[in-house]
Regions:
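Class I S-adenosyl-L-methionine-dependent methyltransferase module
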Residues: 1-29, 41-46, 133-135
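Residue-level recognition of the N-termini of beta-strands and the immediately preceding loop/turn
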Residues: 25, 48-50, 83-87
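Generic beta-strand/beta-sheet core signal
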Residues: 30, 54-55, 89-91
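Non-transmembrane, aqueous-exposed alpha-helical and coiled segments at domain scale
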Residues: 41, 48-49, 67, 96
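A short SAM/SAH-binding and catalytic strip from SAM-dependent methyltransferases
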Residues: 50-63
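C-terminal substrate-binding/active-site "lid" region of AdoMet-derived donor-dependent transferases
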Residues: 61-112
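A cross-taxonomic marker for long C-terminal extensions/tails that follow the last structured domain
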Residues: 97-135
Length: 135
């Protein structure tokens, strides 16, 4: 939802809609844990990176589904190679801090975890840490 006086947010929304129209995403209905387990079990083409990305999603999952998804990602991470890397990118609230949203990336085969940014939930402000300053 976008209030009429939120011009910057409306511009971001319109840009996102234009991108989605130009490059329609594939949408699959189903259980998130089942889908993740299935997709990560599929063969990965050499020279491609696989990215699992979620935004303001994790908090709505039952704990069992969170555990299954995390286990599937960790299992896929163990088989990742430099030619077939895996990334887990999340934009989620961190209940242990008062900061708004946290942008985090974990990459395999190294298993490196990066805290890339702390952000306003709707993009009004971004404190970018990047790789060099990741906490």
């Amino acid at each position: 939802y976008c209030w009429p006086d939120q011009h910057d947010r409306l511009a971001r929304l319109e840009a996102a809609i234009a991108i989605a129209r130009a490059f329609p995403p594939a949408v699959a209905a189903g259980d998130a844990a089942d889908w993740t387990e299935h997709m990560l079990a599929e063969p990965q083409a050499k020279g491609t990176a696989r990215i699992v990305m979620h935004s303001v999603f994790w908090q709505y999952l039952p704990v069992d589904a969170q555990k299954r998804i995390e286990a599937a990602i960790l299992k896929a991470g163990k088989t990742a190679t430099p030619d077939c890397p895996l990334g887990w990118l999340s934009f989620e609230p961190d209940p242990s801090t008062i900061s708004p949203m946290q942008l985090r990336l974990r990459v395999w085969p190294s298993g490196e975890s990066l805290h890339l940014a702390a952000c306003h939930p709707h993009g009004a402000s971004i404190n970018w840490y990047g790789r060099e300053n990741s906490a």
